[in-house]
């Protein structure tokens, strides 16, 4: 209704924009889906959102407990950490501050809780649990097929004084 067009980017296209843009100060990505949570009462389906390491910072979102994600946690095999949504933490863990450091099973894999978002945090991709994106071979710019899989939501902050025309031209230059 506001005239804004929304579409996804492939992982290689996201990395190209992130690395080659001359107009964005910061570019972050997210994707999500339903995952099974075990170890907290009965098994249940929760909404899991994978985000790039600077996603929370770009949006000005802070943690009430613990921390957000570190850049190295986007590496293969190093992304088994989660940040919980504040409301989810209240409902499922009764607001227990001892949740930080606890291990949860999500989709059959162990994840360590490293933080809880502050009350009132409203990310554009609301979820119950947030985990880092895994930058691996699917993020390789050389993977042509990967460019056809446009599953990432992408957000960016343009530099001071950069208008929409310059951003558009920059994105066209990148491809």
Predicted stretch roles:
Residues 1-5, 44-47, 73:
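Acyl-group handling in specialized metabolite and lipid biosynthesis
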Residues 1-34, 149-155, 170:
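Membrane-proximal extracellular/periplasmic loop immediately following the first transmembrane helix
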Residues 34-35, 47-71, 80-175:
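Mid-to-C-terminal secondary-structure elements
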Residues 38-41:
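Short acidic, glycine/proline-rich loop/turn micro-motifs
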């Amino acid at each position: 209704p506001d005239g804004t067009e929304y579409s996804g980017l492939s992982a290689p296209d996201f990395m190209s924009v992130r690395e080659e843009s001359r107009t964005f100060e910061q570019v972050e990505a997210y994707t999500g889906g339903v995952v099974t949570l075990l170890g907290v009462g009965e098994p249940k389906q929760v909404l899991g959102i994978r985000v790039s390491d600077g996603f929370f910072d770009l949006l000005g979102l802070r943690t009430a407990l613990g921390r957000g994600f570190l850049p190295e946690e986007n590496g293969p095999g190093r992304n088994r950490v989660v940040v919980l949504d504040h409301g989810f933490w209240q409902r499922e863990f009764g607001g227990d501050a001892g949740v930080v450091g606890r291990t949860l099973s999500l989709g059959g894999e162990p994840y360590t809780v490293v933080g809880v978002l502050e009350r009132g945090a409203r990310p554009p991709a609301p979820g119950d649990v947030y985990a880092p994106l895994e930058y691996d071979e699917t993020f390789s710019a050389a993977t042509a097929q990967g460019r056809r899989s446009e599953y990432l939501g992408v957000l960016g902050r343009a530099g001071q004084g950069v208008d929409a025309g310059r951003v558009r031209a920059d994105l066209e230059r990148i491809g």
